[in-house]
Amino acid sequence: ISHKLANLGLKSGDRILVKSPKCKETLSLYLSSILTGAVFFPLNSSYTLNETIYFIEDSKPTILICESSEVKSIKPICDKIGCKILSLNANGEGEVTNGLEDLDNFFKPNNRAKDDLAALLYTSGTTGKPKGAMLTHQNLVSNALQLINLWNIDKSDTLIHALPIYHTHGLFVAINTSMMSGASIRFIKNFNIDLVIEAFKFSTLMI
């Protein structure tokens, strides 16, 4: 996926807006954007078109990822700002994953400084329009390492992940701590109490 993004012109410092469902391919997009040196901007997949337009115009992404059913309605605003648009659906299929077998498995990461921007998250907008909050690579790394130490997470742990992945706790806390500690993840796409209770039998952590 990193090769595909780079081939589309995504480079260090560019923003990639990801409005796709919770699936492992969306997580791959997050990791791929970090490898390319881009700024990852996850967006609530349930936002309306008008809400989405605001975030596009304000963040000015280079690439936008959404479900195929939304491409037609979002494309005009992307064309207006010169943003490329690709599809990714809940089953992991779409333009993002098409043709990956023809690309090299190895991607040399673009070097980034610890204070370079890694991710962009918007506030809820309770006092006005949502505002972009900037997270650096050092922000993400230091946060994950502190929590790994505080919670004593290691490779023997298995995390129940039942949160959305478009906000801090569901993406940066849960995913980063698991990846950096070597822990496993039981990935529940939509919260379901029966699935969560069943997962208790095989897990040591829940977020």
Question: What do these predicted regions represent?
Answer:
Residues V141-T158, T168-M206:
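Conserved AMP-binding/adenylation subdomain of ANL enzymes
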